[in-house]
């Protein structure tokens, strides 16, 4: 057998194996791999809409453009206790089925402290906190909006000292 042909076939087979997990994922699943929380594509889209209400697109990219809803999903899955994850999911359920104007109204009311239940308050607290955290630590903000110094608080030997 020709060595080039064998190497070519092995590379094609390896590429197919690398793509296999994405093809086996069921339709309607979340686009981020989650271990502890179960979300579907509709809930992921809803999180994206809520994040976009929290940080809308202006002259800078909004939350959806930066993928902050994916960050929130991963943070809730990895960093929160199971009871907080359950409260997050039950709070998210209250936002399902709302049209965009009703969704915005509900987010404004919950942000003003007029939530119907503690689960909704817990959901919105986590959602807002992690959305802002993700925005401030996003690549766009850290490279375009924050002045970066290689060595922060450098030594200034000529600083005037009053005696």
What are these regions (language model features)?
Residues 10-15:
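Sec-dependent signal peptide hydrophobic core
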Residues 63:
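A glycine-rich, hydrophobic loop/mini-helix early in the fold
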Residues 2, 6-9, 131:
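Short, hydrophobic/aromatic alpha-helical segments in well-folded domains
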Residues 45, 49-52, 67-163:
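Mature-region segments of soluble proteins
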Residues 17-18, 114:
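A short hydrophobic/aromatic micro-motif that marks alpha-helical segments and, especially, helix-coil
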Residues 1-5, 20-54:
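C-terminal segment of N-terminal export signals and the immediately downstream linker at the start
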Residues 32-38, 54-60, 74-82:
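Second-shell loop/turn segments in exported
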